[in-house]
Amino acid sequence: MNMQDQVREWQRGGYTISTDDARLDIPTIHDFIANQSYWGRGRAVEVVQRALEHSLNFGLYHGKQQVGFARVVTDYATFAWVADVFVLAEHRGRGLSKWLMEVILAHPQLQGFRRWVLATKDAHSLYERFGFIPLHRPERWMERPDPNMQENPDYWRTVRRNR
């Protein structure tokens, strides 16, 4: 259930960040996740759409063109997970990912949580600026991964065929 009470927008130097789901360019988001990201290669558009429906989404736009994205999966009470963060290559190097994280962490509905988490292979220095650290007590965390997903670039195509 999407708990958004209202659409919010932020402007900076010709760019806009918006929580308006109606503005999301699903083909752009899907293309990046399924074809350019290391974490979601091959992910079906239906899976991306379902994830968007159950997240607080932050679209990054230059004019009307979507150039970046992030989403937060949360219970709006104690826990938030930042996922699927990206800025298209031609818009990188302008501080947009930093601005996106500033906006997310300042969002009024995302305050007072006990814990924020995320996973990254290559952007540790970005997230450290915002107080993210390696898991404090990793021995307390567990995961239940799909054994077929681990490092399998065809995972999402396989899931799609078997459903």
Model segments located where?
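Short beta->alpha linker loops
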Residues: 21, 43, 64, 121-122
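Conserved acetyl-CoA pyrophosphate-binding loop and the N-cap/start of the following alpha-helix
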Residues: 91-100
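A conserved beta-strand-loop-helix scaffold within acyl/acetyltransferase catalytic domains
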Residues: 43-86
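Short amphipathic alpha-helix that is part of the acyltransferase structural core
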Residues: 2-43, 153-163
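Short loop segments at secondary-structure junctions
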Residues: 63-64, 90-91, 145-148
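Conserved active-site alpha-helix within GNAT-family acetyltransferase domains
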Residues: 110-146
